[in-house]
Amino acid sequence: CVAPDRFSHGETMINNDVLRSIRYMLDLSDNKVIELISLPDPAYSIDKAQLDGFLKKEDEEGFVQCRDVVLAHFLDGLVLHCRGRNENLPPRPVEKRVNNNVVLKKLRVAFELKDVDMHQVFSEAGFPISKPEMSALFRQPGHKNFRLCGDQLLRNFLKGLTLRVRGA
């Protein structure tokens, strides 16, 4: 039985929260974030003023909603930064839509997390999940066992990953 608050029905954590959380987790400078965003496609870039708007809280003056394309470039840049670029393969197209499942998948790839690592990350955040729950998150959207990753699940994953990375 799946607790109703563990999986969402369409709700997605705002991109700005994800960007801020990963930036804090890895202690990235503004310049490094900008560099990661342009890493998958040097023709795509943002400037410091845009990043400042993305990093503000929703209720702060100057807040700018981080679009899916920006977060997708950032996550792909993070994967390339952590894993390197495979010159034998053509570049992967950047995701057009980013939801919590995509964020989870990109972070899993970037940090080379196996199932056991994923379970540890969730447990370290005080939010253990079962094997069937986890496998449902990584299924294709049309699959009968696919589940959307809810905000609570993603927040706890980011919290656990931050504890692991920062050693806090």
Tell me what each language-model feature is:
Residues 1-12:
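Short, Lys/Arg-enriched N-terminal segments with co-localized hydrophobic residues
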Residues 7, 45-48, 74, 78, ...:
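Membrane-targeting and insertion segments and their boundary/processing signals
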Residues 11, 73-100, 168:
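Intrinsic disorder/low-complexity detector
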Residues 13-20, 29-66, 91, 127-150:
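A cross-kingdom feature marking solvent-exposed beta-strand/loop segments within repeated
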Residues 57, 61, 77-84, 113, ...:
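Amphipathic alpha-helical interaction surfaces
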Residues 146-168:
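Short, Lys/Arg-rich amphipathic alpha-helical interaction segments
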